[in-house]
Structures are given as C-alpha cells and as structure tokens.
Amino acid sequence: MFATFINYLDGVYLSAQDIGISLNDIRIVSQLSEHVLDNVDPGPYTAKGIYYALRSVKDHYFNGSNEDILIQGFGSVGSNLASHLLDEGTKIYVDETDEMKLNKALKLGCHPCKSIFKTSASIFSPCAIGGILNKEFIKNSTYKVICGGANNQLLSDNLFNEIHSHGMLYIPDFLVNAGGVIGLTKDVLERDDEMTDRALAKIGEVVKSIIDEFKLKNTIPLEFVKNRFL
C-alpha cells in the first residue's frame, strides 16, 4: 500500500529511511516503486551535518567554549552525532527511553538524564520525534541554544519567535538536518566523499549567518529564515 501511494504521487515525493522505516524496509519498497532513495543510511550524514552546525554554534555563539550538550534520541542520528562530539571531549547527556540504546550511550561515555530540564547542558539537540518544542518546553527550559536533527521540532510555527523572545537561539531543523538529503542524493548528483563532506560543512556556514543575525537583532523572524534559505 505504501509503494502504491508513492507511485500515485509520481515522483513529487521520494521516500527514504526515517523513524519507523529501516533501510531494509525501504529497499523492499524499492521493488515496487522507483520513487525511493535506498542507496545509503542517511543517519550518519544527518549527524555529520548537525555536528558542523554545533561546531559553528560553539565557535561563533559560545566563542569557542566546549559547552555541554543534551542529545534527545540515540538512534542512527543521535549515536553518530555523539561519537563526533565525544571525540572533541564534549560532555553529553542523553535522553532516551529505549534501555538498550541508553546503555549503548552510557558505554560510549555519555551521561543519563532524569529530565531534559535538569542538566548542566547549554545546548539541546533533539534527534528523535517532532513536536518537542512547545509552551511547556519554553517555560521550563534553561538552554541557550536548540540545534538538532528531529523533523518538525516546533509544535507550531508561532512558537519560533516565542523561543527567541525567551533568550534562546533556535536553529531551524530544516537547515540543521539537511545532511540526510545531502547523503541520500550524493549518488544521483555524482558527488564523491570529499564533495559530500564539503556540502555538509556548508551547513555550519549557514548556521554562522543565523547566529550573526541573532546577535545583531536578538531575534530571528521565521520569515527571514524561510526567505533566505528555502
């Protein structure tokens, strides 16, 4: 049925691995539809893009300080992101309901958290389900920056400016998680690993421009981001 629906869209939408759909699942779908991208697991590419975004946050927002980070979700994206950050000596807290995934995180050197509102982390990196950024989060959060790979993090778009009015810098998910699409399309665009990594690194450059705007105006209208980057 899923393949039938994708075929009905006739190429307007291309499906790929994501939450609830494994790479093996999508390869089965590819037997019934050509409108899929099943060449790679996008998770590591998404994670590398987030890493470049976070590195830009550390360099340009925190002036090089290696701030603590809370990663929510320790699947393909969260675990790969943690590996990059741990290599730099970053202290990482992990919010994960799956006990096996949490144990994996702890073995790597991450720290558990009982509540996302009770850690020393300055940066919140949501890499699980969407809708996590709601009024309760804004009210209780002490984070300075939100920068993660989960899709549709805002419960509603009108919370975008509200987050910034509370002094938090939110880097939009559709910019931060672009690495997944970059990885999925590398074969279609005939990019080698070096070209792909350069494309991923550009995510960090985009994040720098957002940080510059935030420092200048202490807010970032959603329209500014969409008009400039979409």
Show where each model-derived region lies:
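Rossmann-like adenosine-cofactor binding region
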Residues: N66, E99-L175
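Flexible, glycine/charged-enriched surface loops at secondary-structure junctions
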Residues: V12-Q17, N63-D68, F214-K226
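Adenosine-phosphate binding glycine-rich loop
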Residues: K144-R228
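Anion (oxyanion) recognition and catalysis
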Residues: N7, L86, L106, H164, ...
